[in-house]
């Protein structure tokens, strides 16, 4: 029985990155032996155990054989006769197929270290094509390591395209797609995830509402980059600069989905795209069972981002209408994420990447001025019933008029 450190821990240590978690492969052991040693079994589909002291995952060395389409159609063989190299062979990328033995020696049968140095994401073997989830994983690793200059190897890109053409991606269940997408949104370069999926054709299959944004023109006066798909990924990149919050990044990604269904005869104008975007956000979230925290912010940004951009030009009563529409008084915790997503949209244009966004500060000030006027104060003044709401509205509008004057409006 021998134990080897495998996968991401070995990769990240060689890259000089913090090791997030340590996974181990055990060769020459049975499940019964692991239990006798005090390990606790947690794997449902194959034998994975938690170490009795460190609680790190230890998996029996295994092989996998494809028996049906999709990512679940596998038969697992995990017996003492499975070698370390056989276990590493079933892994997705060469950079994830390295191990260290108990003495710390590197075991690298598929040249993962060379691919690390060449900054290549390369599949280990043709068996890569048996699991369509690997397409999503490659895209996610590309998003994680983009800042280090990694790219997908040409032969791996070609294999991914063949997998998509063969319909393998169609077998992915929504929850698994969202799981990988959510993780990708948290990576350093989330736009790269969608670029890789687009390159292999998977974006059109999984996220057609994003794919159809590419090639759709916008007015060059406001969008020097012109292409709506290019703009969308620029906005996502800006959102990643502004915040690590994945809900903000998702809202940035989906804020303009309605521009993909703009009638051709009104292009490059996109009149009414906000409501179309809202409808598409709901459909996307329903399809992938995306949590409400993502849906709620994305809908807010899709519907109201134009008001944010025009904040300095709006009448005070219109600013108040927007704040009420955003539910900013009852749900103030969502207001700052909304403003950050709008700032990302403003900056996600060629030549605008580092420009200030004073609209956000203006709306923050407007929100604060309105919050300072409460219904409780009006009740204390003796107002009742409808008069409270009317007075609250009037005083908030007056406060916003004063604010606009202070800002030179």
UniProtKB/Swiss-Prot annotation:
Signal peptide as annotated in the record = none
Q: Tell me which residues make up the HD domain.
A: 228-329
One family name in Pfam for this protein: PolyA_pol_RNAbd
GO: which molecular function terms? ATP binding; CCA tRNA nucleotidyltransferase activity; cyclic-nucleotide phosphodiesterase activity; magnesium ion binding; phosphatase activity; tRNA binding
Cofactor requirement: Mg(2+); Ni(2+)
What positions does the entry give for Mg(2+) binding?
21, 23
Which cysteines does the record link by disulfide bonds? none
The UniProt entry, under InterPro entries, shows: CCA_bact (IPR012006), HD/PDEase_dom (IPR003607), HD_domain (IPR006674), NT_sf (IPR043519), PolA_pol_head_dom (IPR002646), PolyA_RNA-bd (IPR032828), tRNA_CCA-adding_enzyme (IPR050124)
According to UniProt, the reaction catalysed is: a tRNA precursor + 2 CTP + ATP = a tRNA with a 3' CCA end + 3 diphosphate; a tRNA with a 3' CCA end + 2 CTP + ATP = a tRNA with a 3' CCACCA end + 3 diphosphate
> A GO term (biological process) for this protein?
RNA repair
Misc remark for this entry? A single active site specifically recognizes both ATP and CTP and is responsible for their addition.
What assembly does the database describe for this protein? Monomer. Can also form homodimers and oligomers.
Query: What family classification does the UniProt entry report for this protein?
Result: Belongs to the tRNA nucleotidyltransferase/poly(A) polymerase family. Bacterial CCA-adding enzyme type 1 subfamily.
Name of this chain's protein: Multifunctional CCA protein
Q: Which gene encodes it?
A: cca
């Amino acid at each position: 029985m021998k134990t080897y450190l495998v996968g991401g821990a070995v990769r990240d240590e060689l890259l000089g990155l913090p090791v997030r978690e340590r996974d181990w492969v055990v060769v020459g052991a049975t499940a019964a032996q692991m239990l006798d040693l005090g390990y606790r079994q947690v794997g449902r589909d194959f034998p994975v155990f938690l170490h009795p002291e460190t609680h790190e995952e230890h998996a029996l060395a295994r092989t996998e054989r494809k028996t049906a389409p999709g990512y679940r159609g596998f038969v697992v063989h995990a017996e003492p006769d499975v070698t370390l190299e056989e276990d590493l062979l079933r892994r997705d990328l060469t950079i994830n197929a390295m191990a260290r033995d108990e003495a710390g020696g590197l075991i690298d049968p598929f040249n993962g270290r060379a691919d690390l140095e060449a900054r290549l994401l390369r599949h280990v073997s043709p068996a890569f094509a048996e699991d369509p989830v690997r397409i999503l994983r490659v895209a996610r690793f590309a998003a994680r390591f983009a800042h280090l200059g990694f790219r997908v190897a040409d032969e791996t890109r070609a294999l991914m395209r063949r997998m998509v053409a063969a319909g393998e991606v169609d077998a992915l269940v929504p929850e698994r797609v969202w799981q990988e997408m959510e993780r990708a949104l948290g990576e350093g370069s989330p736009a790269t995830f969608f670029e890789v999926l687009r390159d292999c054709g998977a974006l059109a299959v999984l996220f057609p509402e994003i794919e159809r944004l590419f090639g759709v023109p916008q007015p060059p006066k406001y969008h020097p980059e012109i292409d709506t798909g290019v703009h969308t990924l620029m906005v996502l990149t800006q959102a990643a600069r502004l915040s690590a919050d994945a809900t903000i990044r998702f809202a940035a990604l989906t804020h303009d989905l309605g521009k993909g269904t703009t009638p051709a005869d009104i292009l490059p104008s996109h009149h009414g795209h906000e409501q179309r975007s809202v409808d598409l956000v709901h459909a996307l979230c329903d399809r992938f069972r995306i949590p409400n925290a993502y849906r709620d912010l994305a809908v807010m940004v899709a519907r109201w981002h134009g008001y944010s951009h025009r904040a300095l030009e709006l009448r005070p009563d219109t600013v108040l209408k927007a704040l009420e529409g955003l539910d900013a008084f009852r749900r103030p915790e969502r207001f700052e994420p909304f403003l950050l997503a709008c700032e990302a949209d403003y900056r996600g244009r060629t030549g605008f990447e580092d420009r200030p966004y004073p609209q956000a500060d203006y709306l923050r000030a407007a929100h604060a001025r309105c919050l300072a006027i409460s219904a409780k104060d009006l009740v204390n003044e003796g107002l009742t019933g409808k008069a409270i709401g009317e007075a609250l509205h009037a005083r908030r509008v007056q406060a916003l008029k004063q604010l606009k004057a202070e800002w030179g409006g």
